[in-house]
From Swiss-Prot:
Disulphide linkage map: C60-C78, C64-C84, C68-C86
Keywords of the record: Antimicrobial, Disulfide bond, Fungicide, Plant defense, Secreted, Signal
Organism per entry: Arabidopsis thaliana
Residues annotated as signal peptide: 1-23
Localization terms from the record: Secreted
Protein name, entry field: Putative defensin-like protein 224
Length: 106
């Protein structure tokens, strides 16, 4: 009887830990990307742990070819000029405009 109660207590503790981890993971995926304290004015960013913990804009992953995403397990980066990169592949989406002041080099 004592073993049975310990088993149920352990199951309850494990399930609460798993639910907390899942909630934390969901909040990380919805967090916006911050570059040197600056908040970029873009749609919400997705967080793919398979790409070195970087944040990837949704529009970037949508524009990059699916074969590139599948082959490299979402190893896609999106630099400030909105170039989608996957290994040697590069795509410049013409319809995404950025402000010249926002990314001007000093």
């Amino acid at each position: 009887m004592k073993t049975l109660s310990l088993f149920f207590t352990l199951v309850i503790l494990i399930s609460s830990c798993v639910s907390n981890l899942m909630a934390k993971h969901d909040s990380e995926r919805k967090a916006p990307f911050s570059n040197h304290g600056m908040r970029l004015q873009h749609p919400p960013y997705l967080h793919f742990q398979s790409y070195r913990g970087h944040f990837i804009p949704e529009e970037c992953t949508e524009l990059c070819p699916q074969r590139c995403l599948r082959r490299h397990r979402l190893m896609v980066s999106c630099i400030p000029q909105h170039f989608c990169r996957c290994s040697s592949f590069q795509l410049s989406p013409p319809h995404i405009a950025t402000s010249p002041k926002q990314y001007s080099k000093k």
